[in-house]
Amino acid sequence: MIKSFNANENNIDKASKLRETDIFTHKDFKVNKIRLVIAYKDKFPIKNSNKKPYQIFWLKGQKAEHYILSSKSSIFLGLSNGNFYFSICVNKPEYSEDMYYDLRTLNPLLDNNDLALLTNSRGLSYWHNKNKFCGICGHETKMTDYGHARICGNEACKNKSFPRLDPAVIMLITYQDYCLLGRQKVWPIGMHSTLAGFVEHGETIEQAVARETFEETGVKIRNIQYKYSQPWPFPSSLMLGFHAEA
């Protein structure tokens, strides 16, 4: 895990109660408080890559409002410092392609607020792209709740679905002064990683750590301790970090 995503390290208010309202009529809303990022192919535009932390290219004011009101795919990301943050994902670049960076690259280069906002945007955009049709009746679905749900367009169905999140564990296994690492055949020579895997139904996260470690290496572990968590929208995980002893 490259960087901590501790919730206390950003001041983003998800403002979930606003999702089912007309945000533009909210008592604190003003056009000059709109902030909009236009993503392209899961990449985000950077204003200036010569300074760190990198600065996201946020559209503001009336231009941002026009994009949001004319789009059927705008996502409300939350509130911060009195501003209303949104994102839209487009199929053609709005700016020069060399302005766009993927989130893996941006991860250690953004401040915590921007990183939290873009992580939210990428995870939700991926889910929307994979859920355009109803899983019950097969009818086309449409975005609702400012990007935080989809609803079936079939009046006889109207099934409402919500974003998927897959819990995954990643663990540092140690024995005395050694640590247990793994690698995949397709990785470059010399590249190794701590072990990781998805949590399955009917098990605790600690059991998932022990199971994944044994399945991948044949090593039994003890003293499993949870450490930290972070969003991992590649494509839709919540990564749970552990330490354990072999």
Regions found by a protein language model. Give the residues of each.
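N-terminal alpha-helical interaction blocks
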Residues: 1-111
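A residue-level detector for short acidic-glycine micro-motifs
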Residues: 79, 173-175, 228
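Cys/His-rich short segments
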Residues: 119-172
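The catalytic Nudix box helix
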Residues: 194-228, 242
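Active-site-adjacent beta-strand/loop module that shapes the phosphate/pyrophosphate-binding cleft
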Residues: 230-246
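N-terminal strand-loop-strand
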Residues: 44, 150-194, 220, 244-246
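A gly/proline- and charged-residue-enriched helix-loop-helix capping module
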Residues: 94-136
